[in-house]
Structures are given as C-alpha cells and as structure tokens.
A protein has these predicted regions:
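Core active-site phosphate/anionic-ligand binding loop and the adjoining beta-turn-alpha structural block
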Residues: 1-63
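C-terminal charged capping/lid subdomain of soluble metabolic enzymes
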Residues: 66-209
Length: 209
C-alpha cells in the first residue's frame, strides 16, 4: 500500500520529491564532493540512511525548540541577490569556474520564488503551529528507530563505515548546504529561512549521531 501511495504521489507531483527530502539532498552533496575530489562514490542508499539519522535528529530539535512568536517574519524572506550570493559562496570553492554554483542556483531560484509566493500559507501555518507540530511528531520517527533498522539489516551506522568514507568536514558541509542544491522544499530550507543557527544545529545532530 505504501509503495503504491508513493508512486501515486510522485506521479501527481511529476517529481521524486515526495520520497526524497533533506536526507537525499545531503547524500547528493556528498556525491558532488566525491566527484570533485575526485574519488569513487559511496553507496547512495546507505548515505541516505545515515543522513536520515542526522535529519530525524534535526526534526526532533525543531519540534522541541521552534516557537513562532520568536521569529521575525520579514527576515524569513531573503532577496534573490542574498540567496544567490549564498549559493555561490558555498559552491564556488569546489568549482572556481562557477558551473556547479550556476546549476545549483538555477534550481534554488525556483524554490525561493515559490517560498515568497506562498507566504500567506506559511503565516497561516504559524498560527496553527501547535496542531501541526503534534501531527508532524506522529509522522516523523525518532532517529533511534532508523538506527535499529540499520542495525537489524547489518548496515553501516556511521559515515566512517562507508567506502570510501567522507570526512567530518565534508559531512558538515553537506548537512549545512544541502538545502541549496535542489528546488524541493525540505526541513533544511525552512531552517535556513528561519535563520536557525546552523553550526549549533550541526553540533547537536552530530553529537546525537
């Protein structure tokens, strides 16, 4: 049933986004780093599973700490110039010619425009955040559930077990910059727009992982 529903969701959206979120974006950035190193790619599915440990931790922190009354709504809507500069600053070091940054920006620009266009929806969600948080908590499994599944199938449970293994700096970079590479909207994007302290969040999820 779940597989069928997933297929329907992808068909209706004309995209894989319903089954491909923040964790997939992290894996894609790790692949991008590997390609530019260059070195062989680690197994994508295993990278996604390990990234899920990070993102489910991030979800739990978000559920626990986010309070709409504490945000400045105007600051949640950066300009195109601001975000283009951020994308270019993130990816230009790995590709001085700018091709990677240009490709990332082409996708990201679509997402940024959509975020601005749906501001009223976000404001409505903020008003109903208590109910939304309760619903989302029931849908997002905690990281220890993912860990139990990985152990049950004898899968790697740490990035250091991947072959080849990314460095901690590369994982940190991927976690922080994954929202900048695709037009799908994930928790990572919301955290960027909320101006969440990414370094603090990284230390929290990395410590928990």
């Amino acid at each position: 049933k779940l597989i069928a529903l997933a297929g329907i969701a992808m068909s209706l959206s004309h995209a894989t986004a319903p089954l491909s979120g923040y964790e997939h974006d992290i894996s894609h950035v790790l692949d991008l780093i590997a390609e530019r190193t260059p070195r062989p790619l680690a197994q994508h599915g295993t990278q996604v599973a390990l990234s899920t440990l990070l993102t489910t931790n991030a979800y739990q922190i978000f559920f626990d700490e986010f309070e709409p009354a504490e945000i400045n709504l105007e600051n949640c809507y950066p300009t195109e110039a601001q975000m283009r500069a951020r994308v270019e600053a993130a990816f230009r070091p790995m590709d001085p010619e700018g091709q990677v940054a240009a490709e990332c920006w082409a996708d990201y620009k679509i997402k940024l425009e959509s975020w601005h266009a749906h501001r009223a929806d976000f404001e409505e969600a903020l008003q109903d955040w208590s109910a939304i948080r309760t619903q989302l908590r029931s849908l997002v499994k905690p990281p220890d559930v993912t860990m139990q599944i990985l152990k049950a199938i004898s899968s790697p449970v740490r990035f250091a077990e991947l072959v080849p293994a990314p460095t901690e700096d590369e994982i940190r970079f991927a976690f922080r910059n994954a929202p900048l590479i695709r037009h799908r909207f994930t928790l990572g994007d919301l955290l960027v727009f909320l101006q969440w302290d990414q370094e603090t969040l990284w230390k929290q999820v990395n410590k928990n992982h």
